[in-house]
Every structure is written in C-alpha cells, then in structure tokens.
C-alpha cells in the first residue's frame, strides 16, 4: 500500500510540475527584431524597461534573417 501511495504522489507532483512549466513558458514575449549591431545588452535593457526580468536575441522561427528580442520572466 505504501509503495502505491508513493508512486501516485510522485505521479501527481510530476503532472503539476509539467503544467506549471507550460504556464511559465507562456510569459516569454518577443518585442521586436534585433539588428546586427543591437546585441543582447540592448535587448536586455529594453525588456527591463518593459518590466520583464530580462531578455535576449534569439531566432524564434527557422529561416529568419534577424533574431527577435524576446523578453522573459525568471522561472524561479
């Protein structure tokens, strides 16, 4: 009985953790393209001004010519 209860508890915790991680990822938001000379520092500063925890230049879609400045909230 104790082993079954332990497995059920682990399963429930895993499901809840996965659902929380999915919701956290929804907070990422791209606010515009990064120019070649733009760099992560400027993107980070713009995201901080927009009340996010930070940001970085990243290619969101395959084949894009310029990366996007994507802001995020810390996952902690």
From Swiss-Prot:
Disulfide bonds join 30-71, 34-57, 43-69, 47-70. InterPro entries: Defensin-like_dom. One of its GO terms (cellular component) is extracellular region. Its main location: secreted. It is found in: Secreted. Keywords: Antimicrobial, Disulfide bond, Fungicide, Plant defense, Secreted, Signal. Residues 1-26 form the signal peptide. The keyword Disulfide bond applies. One of its GO terms (biological process) is defense response to fungus. It holds the Pfam family Defensin. Belongs to the DEFL family. This is Putative defensin-like protein 62.
């Amino acid at each position: 009985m104790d082993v079954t209860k332990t497995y059920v508890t682990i399963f429930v915790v895993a499901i809840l953790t996965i659902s929380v991680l999915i919701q956290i990822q929804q907070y990422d938001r791209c606010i515009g393209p990064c120019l070649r000379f733009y760099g992560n520092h400027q993107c980070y500063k713009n995201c901080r001004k927009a009340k996010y925890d930070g940001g970085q230049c990243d290619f969101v879609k395959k084949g894009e010519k310029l990366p996007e400045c994507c802001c995020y909230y810390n996952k902690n």
